[in-house]
């Protein structure tokens, strides 16, 4: 492994419609097989559905949903003397966002609505009201970290 220099974080270009970097990142998380235009259509349709249902600013609903899904702690496996412990660790801010987006998309894909846009809109609305599968996932991760608090001294 070369020891030249640390490669910096790439700047992500804001999305074309709302000029939001957060939304651009979310589009990249939704995207499958490199089909970015399809991912953009899904996101924008979901935001339109949210605007119809809520009447509020749809970007605020997205931000609220992500706030309610972001984990503050997670567990990592650590092998100590032949046994593996689940060690609770704090989550870096960039990873918090990434996990929140990933969990929102995974939860939306498991929902029953007809189109992905409707599923995503439903999950974002649920998450903004502190309910739904993605919020449950965050609570499970926090519960796991709380249960393994005794192993916190194994942090690295």
UniProtKB/Swiss-Prot annotation:
Signal peptide, first to last residue: none
Gene Ontology molecular functions: rRNA binding; structural constituent of ribosome; tRNA binding
Superkingdom, taxonomy of origin: Bacteria
Keyword annotations from UniProtKB, A to Z: Ribonucleoprotein, Ribosomal protein, RNA-binding, rRNA-binding, tRNA-binding
The keyword Cell inner membrane is assigned to this record: no
InterPro entries: Ribosomal_uS7, Ribosomal_uS7_bac/org-type, Ribosomal_uS7_CS, Ribosomal_uS7_dom, Ribosomal_uS7_dom_sf
CDD domains: uS7_Bacteria
Assembly and oligomerization: Part of the 30S ribosomal subunit. Contacts proteins S9 and S11.
Official protein name in the record: Small ribosomal subunit protein uS7
Organism: Shewanella sp. (strain ANA-3)
């Amino acid at each position: 492994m070369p020891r030249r220099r640390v490669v910096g974080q790439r700047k992500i270009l804001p999305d074309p419609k709302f000029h939001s970097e957060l939304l651009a990142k979310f589009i990249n998380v939704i995207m499958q097989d490199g089909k970015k235009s399809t991912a953009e259509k899904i996101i924008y349709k979901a935001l339109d559905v949210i605007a119809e249902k809520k009447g509020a600013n749809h970007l605020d609903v997205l931000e609220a949903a992500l706030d309610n899904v972001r984990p503050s702690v997670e567990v990592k496996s650590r092998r100590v003397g032949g046994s593996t412990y689940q060690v609770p660790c704090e989550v870096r801010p960039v990873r918090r966002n990434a996990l929140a987006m990933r969990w929102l998309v995974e939860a939306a894909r498991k929902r029953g609505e007809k189109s992905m846009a409707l599923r995503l809109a439903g999950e974002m609305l649920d998450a903004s009201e502190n309910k739904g599968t993605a919020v449950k996932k965050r609570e499970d991760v926090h519960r796991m970290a709380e249960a393994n608090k005794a192993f916190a001294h194994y942090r690295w």
